[in-house]
Structures are given as C-alpha cells and as structure tokens.
Amino acid sequence: MKIWVDADACPVVIKEILFKAADRTKIAITLVANHHVRIPPSPFISFMQVSSGFDVADDEIVKRIEANDLVITSDIPLADEVIDKSGIALSPRGELYTKENIKSRLNIRDFMDTMRASGVHTGGPPALNQTDRQNFANHLDRIITQFKKTQ
C-alpha cells in the first residue's frame, strides 16, 4: 500500500496527520500538486510537482496508483477513478468513498455544478472542524490497520 495525496486542496492539518502516520507506520506517502508543497524530512514522505492545468495532478495520481493504494482527495471524479482501479479513496473530512456511495456523490456534484453554472450561489463546504479531523484520523488508522493485518 502506498498513500497518494491530492495536495492542491488538502488542508494543512490533514497533511500533518498524514506526515505523522507515515513516520509511525513506515508507509510511503506521496503528495502530488501543481505548486510547491513543503514536506518534513522523512524517508517515507515525498512530493511530486506536476505542471499547472486542469486535473493534471489527478491524472498523475490515477496513472500511478495500484490496487489497494489509498488516495486522499476531496475531488469526487478522482475518487471515482481511484475506486475503478481498485484503490481506496478517503476525503480530508474522513468520508470513505465506496462503490456504493460514489455514484450518488458524483450526481450531487454534477447537480451543484449545474446550479453554479446557472448563476445560483451555492457556497462552499464548511470549514474543517475537530470532528472532521478526528473522523479522518480514525478512518486513516482503520485503513492502515487493515492493510498491516494482510502483510
């Protein structure tokens, strides 16, 4: 298992949780973004900068993931592609995307895009709170624990 992070929009506090998990579990984490992201010195943490452009980081992640790799993203279409490649997709809020829920999440996303395109102001998601951070950390620990049991 390798952990990939769609780092362009990943909150700093979530990256910090991931950095600690990488050192604690010795699982490799790669952050992918189209701008520089500071990472701590660690043999388990790397950064890949891609060129600017629509979905360039997403496409790079999809190209490189393997079955059972974990991808941290709030991008619903990316999560869908990860699931199609037998990967695991987890949002920074701790929502585990699955075959059972990804299509409805895509439909909601598409509906909201349509609303925004027609001029309706839909607002953004609420700020990440302590419950979201705890939910993310708990799901991350469960996924890593399951992976370690299979090793």
UniProtKB/Swiss-Prot annotation:
Matches recorded under InterPro entries: UPF0178
Highest taxon above the source species: Bacteria
Xref: HAMAP family: UPF0178
Protein family membership: Belongs to the UPF0178 family.
NCBIfam families cross-referenced by the UniProt entry: PRK00124.1
Protein name per Swiss-Prot or TrEMBL: UPF0178 protein CPS_3584
Organism encoding this protein: Colwellia psychrerythraea (strain 34H / ATCC BAA-681) (Vibrio psychroerythus)
